[in-house]
A protein has these predicted regions:
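GIY-YIG nuclease catalytic motif and its immediate N-terminal context
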Residues: 1-31, 61-74
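Short arginine-rich
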Residues: 35-45, 72-85
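Conserved short loop/helix modules at catalytic or binding sites
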Residues: 23-67
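Active-site or metal-binding loop neighborhoods of secreted/extracellular toxin and effector enzymes
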Residues: 88
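Generic structural motif recognizing short loop/turn segments at the entrances and edges of beta-strands
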Residues: 2, 13-15, 46-52, 80-81
Length: 88
């Protein structure tokens, strides 16, 4: 699991988050996003930094649980009023 802070992806004055899961370390995955490797365009363009306080306590976890947690974490952030990408 990892969460990336996005600098104003919609141009509406609100910042947002990207929620994802990976078999890599969150740092390696973020670096790949920024370099355009298997990347979500929104992270490549607007990703500023990882937000460990939102995911560090969840890692590591098995793949099946991570799939469910990715959706749950994204939904939780949306319910708190954040713009959220990913979390499928």
């Amino acid at each position: 699991m990892y969460v990336v802070y996005l600098r104003n992806p919609k141009g509406d004055g609100k910042a947002g988050y990207y929620v994802g899961m990976t078999g890599l370390s969150p740092e390696q995955r973020f670096e790949n996003h920024k370099k355009g490797r298997k990347a979500a365009r929104v992270v490549t363009r607007y990703g500023e930094r990882l937000v460990p306080r939102l995911f560090a306590h969840l890692n590591p976890m098995p793949y099946a649980k991570a799939k469910d947690m990715e959706v749950a974490l994204a939904d939780s952030l949306r319910k708190r009023g954040y713009v959220v990408y990913g979390g499928h």
